[in-house]
């Protein structure tokens, strides 16, 4: 499968995720936020969104130095996934492991969204972005499930 180099990975998001976001926001999206693991989601969705509106800001989420957030990586230049194109990301926001875990817990307890740590990181970045911009329509991808993290202790009994 090799989702880090498989062109079908971003293609699925170019053909599916991007058009769905555009349709569901009625073209109102101003910012797209996505964690950067394989980078397939952000690559394919960015490609589609920039084709329909180049003004949409694409924001990648990376862990702060020293943080370990499953599913989100801080890629050294020499190890970037084969599908990654830097020109498709306008900028990145760093998120700490603690913020990612706390946001995942808050989403579960307050909103009933049982997501994983990488999704917590993406939502934390989107919330940070929302404090920096006015009148924005920010779309963030929740890409993992919380059941994969039950053994980590971030979700209390």
What does each model-identified segment do?
Residues 127-157:
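Phosphate-binding loop/pocket of nucleotide- and phosphate-handling active sites
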Residues 50-117, 132, 153-157:
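Active-site/ligand-binding loops adjacent to catalytic centers
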Residues 35-45, 118-126, 149:
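Short glycine/serine/threonine-rich phosphate/pyrophosphate-binding segments
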Residues 2-36, 98-114:
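Active-site/ligand-binding-proximal alpha/beta "capping" segment
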Residues 44-52, 124-134:
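Alpha-helix C-terminal capping segments
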Residues 20-61:
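Glycine-rich cofactor phosphate-binding loops and adjacent beta1-alpha1 units
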Residues 1, 33, 59, 91-93, ...:
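Hydrophobic/aromatic beta-strand patches that form the interior of the parallel beta-sheet core
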Residues 5-8, 37-40, 62-67, 76, ...:
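Glycine-rich beta-alpha junction loops
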């Amino acid at each position: 499968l090799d989702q880090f180099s498989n062109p079908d990975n971003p293609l699925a998001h170019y053909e599916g995720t991007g058009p769905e976001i555009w349709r569901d926001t009625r073209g109102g999206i101003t910012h797209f936020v996505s964690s950067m693991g394989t980078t397939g989601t952000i690559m394919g969705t960015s490609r589609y969104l920039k084709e329909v509106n180049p003004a949409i800001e694409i924001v990648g989420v990376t862990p702060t130095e020293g943080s370990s957030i499953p599913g989100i990586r801080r890629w050294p230049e020499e190890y970037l996934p084969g599908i990654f194109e830097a020109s498709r990301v306008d900028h990145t926001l760093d998120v700490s492991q603690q913020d990612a875990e706390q946001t995942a817990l808050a989403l579960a307890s307050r909103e009933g969204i049982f997501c994983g740590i990488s999704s917590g990181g993406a939502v934390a970045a989107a919330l940070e972005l929302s404090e920096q911009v006015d009148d924005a329509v920010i779309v963030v991808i929740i890409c993992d499930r919380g059941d994969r993290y039950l053994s980590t202790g971030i979700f209390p009994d």
